[in-house]
Amino acid sequence: MSKSFYVTTPIFYVNDAPHIGHAYTEVACDVLTRWHRQRGEDAFLLTGTDEHGEKVLRTALGNHTDPRSWTDKLVTESWLPLLETIDIDNQDFIRTTEPRHEVAVQKFLQDLYDKDFIYQGSFEGNYCVGCEEYKNDGDLIDGQGEFDGQRVCAIHSKPVEQLNETNYFFKLSEFQDRLLKHYEDNPTFVQPASAKNEVVSFVKQGLSDLSISRSKERFDWGIDIPWDSDHITYVWFDALLNYITAIGYGSDQEKLDLLWPADVQVVGKDILRFHAVIWPAMLMAAGLQPPKQVFGHGWLLVGGEKMSKSKLTGISPNQITDIFGSDAFRYYFMKAIGFGSDGSFSWEDLSARYNAELANGFGNLASRTVAMVTRYFDGIIPEPGEYLDADNQVMAVAKKA
């Protein structure tokens, strides 16, 4: 059996309900998958939710519940209904709290530990709970307003925390040369070109080993390190593995071979380094192929800022689909925003395009077609005739497009 065309959305962090930025990514991946499917290819779309980590735990406690109940509620009431709301035809939905994922993560960890790619050490640094990531000084900016005088995360605009921990580390630094060679040998591995340039520049500066565990003395919402029950797995190391645990890693080699490596992994540019640096290094360490391509799309902006629930700039997809419908939602975000670049959303632009391009453009075409069928064929669409050479030539060109 030939390999299926495998597309993944990013594994979405489930500390809150989805906004249109998440839906934008889902639609883009769905459109790509459907395009390959209509060409007669077998295509597989994976999406899902990342449910571990300190941020989820803090959010749950802030809502007077436990993290499992909190994530169950969000997935059931918000994330799964989103797929139906915007007509996503995914073949699987994985949650990182599922046993199939947790067991496979521990297998992967044990494999890397046995191969001497993991060791125990100490680390001190600036930690952003929102990003679930240690930050370099260059990743921080001066705070404003209530955070004036403090250094804050450039993405979340909130102060980082100074942490000193003894954790387990993945030998990421050993993969610098292999990664650079992979980028050179596979020039379309990271797309668009601006994203590739950023990744290559980052790796050339030198890579530090990656802390991949957290002590249970801090918090315990995560997957146990298999050889040390006093530690849980770093949420990003856990989350990245969903792309293979969902398709049979450690349990169904035939399915894994059918789908992996992924053909396209679509991510937001703010998590590009995880997917274009850490993720391929993890796979190389395990003896697995990296994905064929990682595409980092731009941010969806509202009022010049990245879409964010915490900054009250998050717009629910239902706010749009309840008025304009799913088809208009999908059309607008694929037409109005250049994929790979930042794009601004406004209600005025959506309404204008809906009227000019859908109602007046496609709407008039449909109306005239129905009128002609009614006038010349008694309202019955005639059976198609045989394809002529010109028809076949047009179809051949379309298939190569």
What are these regions (language model features)?
Residues 2-47, 95, 100-104, 155-375:
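Structured secondary-structure scaffolds
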Residues 49-55, 59:
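Short, charge-patterned binding micro-sites
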Residues 59-74:
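A charged helix-plus-loop insertion that forms the helical arch/lid used to bind
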Residues 70-139:
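A broadly conserved sequence feature marking short terminus-proximal activation segments
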Residues 75-76, 176, 363-370, 391, ...:
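Hydrophobic faces of stable alpha-helices that mediate helix-helix packing
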Residues 115-176, 180:
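Cys/His-rich short segments
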Residues 377-400:
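Acidic, turn-prone loop/beta-hairpin segments
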